[in-house]
Amino acid sequence: MAAQGVSKAQYLQRYLSGPPAAQPRRRRKKKLPSGSGRAGMRIVDDDVGWSSIAAVPEKEEEEDEGDMPVVAEFIDERPDEVKLMEEFRTNSKWKLLGDRDEDSPSSDVSVPAKATTRQQRHDSPDNSPPRRVRHDSPDLSPPRQERNNSASLLPRKERQHGSPDLSPPRRKRHDSPDLSPPRRKRHDDSPDLSPPRRKRHDSPDLSPPRRKRHDSPDLSPPRRQRHDSPDPSPPRKKRHDSPDLSPQEQQTTPDLSLQRKKRYDSDPDSSPSLRKRARSPGHKKPSRTKDASPVKKLRRDSDSPPPRRGTQNASEADLSPQGKNHRALPSGKGQHGSKSPPDLSRHHYPDDKGSPKKGNMMSGVRAGLVSADVLRREQQELRKQERSSKHLEEESRHTETIFRDKSGRKRDLVQERLEQQQKDEAKSERDEQYARWGRGLAQGRQQQQNVEDAIKEMQKPLARYIDDEDLDRMLREQEREGDPMAEFIRKRKAKESKEKKEKPRYSGPAPPLNRFNIWPGHRWDGVDRSNGFEQQFFARMANKKAVQELAYKWSIEDM
């Protein structure tokens, strides 16, 4: 299983580094419609007179000038545009048309999207012959001669060489700083044309590296020779069709342009990395200078893209997707131009950090095909997290639950239970007292006395005899109707009650009735101070009773 996993990883690496021969052709065909439309427009520009289409390029040029970050991206192309301006001061409209229609350096200066469109044109083999015509028309015309007069032949030839062959433009972009002294010469020769865009590019800090790069005379003569030899060079355009050279060129071109941009824009973070990139392709560049000419010859003879793809896979497997992305850029000029630097910086470190957009699963493990080292690292991290959380689990098991009220204060449940118990006891006592009062205190006492008497009688033998004292006393105390001794008995009880000091009772005329038969106090003066409710109550009861009696008598009248 491990061997199969390694084979899959190798297969994925091959697939990502270099797509198969059929896929890049299809991608080129997809990208051709956007680039082909522009190529068709350029062909129409060649056919139509320069004066008729002059107005449209002026607007585009103004838009390019207004888009400052896009202008800052391609420094080499801007100085070339300055050369075109110097050469054709009399007619600025024709210069703008030449910048866009032809693959001249002015088009490179205008927008990075235009540079990418060139790459697309080089990628499309059908558009190569018209490009030759375009290169022949502006390159052979006075522009080159005037550039020779203005001592700026090297950048011009480099650009001309960059238009048919993408490998030389890489050198040109790596050699982009040698164009800085010609800029100074141009500013010295024609200071009027420099201010619009070149104020940013005229930053003196960037000039010394350009001098150093411009001081290297080795790159300029080979370019002239190569440009002189392959003027009619459809195979070179086919080289641009080759995916390995085109992505390399595209990647080197945005890198150098970004270096210049960042130098002029004073971006210290990304500039050193871009310079290192420019140096690294620069080291590759001598190999290109030595090896590119025989390779070009072989490609001219063979005209077959597959070996180029192989070289692309061998040399720059990571740069190929960047080149494709740059080819897709021309649709959005300013936006893609401004977004290109971060994209390139990401592609610089694909192996160290991996793709930043890789997804992770819910468990935190990286998704997709992962190496054994990455899995081992992830497992170790998970184990560390589990160990760090173990002591928390132990503490949480034995800790008491903390309850809080709405205000956030801790609740003492034990104290709350005690308080609630006390409240319940007090409530039960109060309820019992009210229940006792409701039943009646006298009735309660009588009931208690009866219970005591019953218990006492239970202790006596079953049969009662006449000489039983308790029975004899109970019978003597009873009052009987018609008993001559009854009055004597009452008086005797009254005397005994006085001795007991009982409360005095009311002894006046009969008081008014009430629902509960409550007797008035002994101090009542006989005045009724009620609201008359009791009288009305008894009147209603008497009326009701009378009606019932009358109805009963009426019902039994015939009987």
UniProtKB/Swiss-Prot annotation:
GO terms for cellular component: nucleus; U2-type precatalytic spliceosome; U2-type spliceosomal complex. InterPro entries: Bud13 (IPR018609), CWC26_splicing_factor (IPR051112). Keywords: Coiled coil, mRNA processing, mRNA splicing, Nucleus, Spliceosome. It comes from the Eukaryota. Residues 245-256 have a biased composition (Polar residues). Residues 344-355, 374-434, 474-483, 496-505 have a biased composition (Basic and acidic residues). Its main location: nucleus. Residues 373-431 form a coiled coil. Residues 1-44, 89-456, 474-517 are annotated as: Disordered. GO terms for biological process: mRNA splicing, via spliceosome. It is found in: Nucleus. The keyword Nucleus applies. Residues 274-287 have a biased composition (Basic residues). Residues 436-449 have a biased composition (Low complexity). Part of the activated spliceosome B/catalytic step 1 spliceosome, one of the forms of the spliceosome which has a well-formed active site but still cannot catalyze the branching reaction and is composed of at least 52 proteins, the U2, U5 and U6 snRNAs and the pre-mRNA. Component of the minor spliceosome, which splices U12-type introns. Involved in pre-mRNA splicing as component of the activated spliceosome. Belongs to the CWC26 family. This is BUD13 homolog. It comes from Gallus gallus (Chicken). The gene is BUD13.
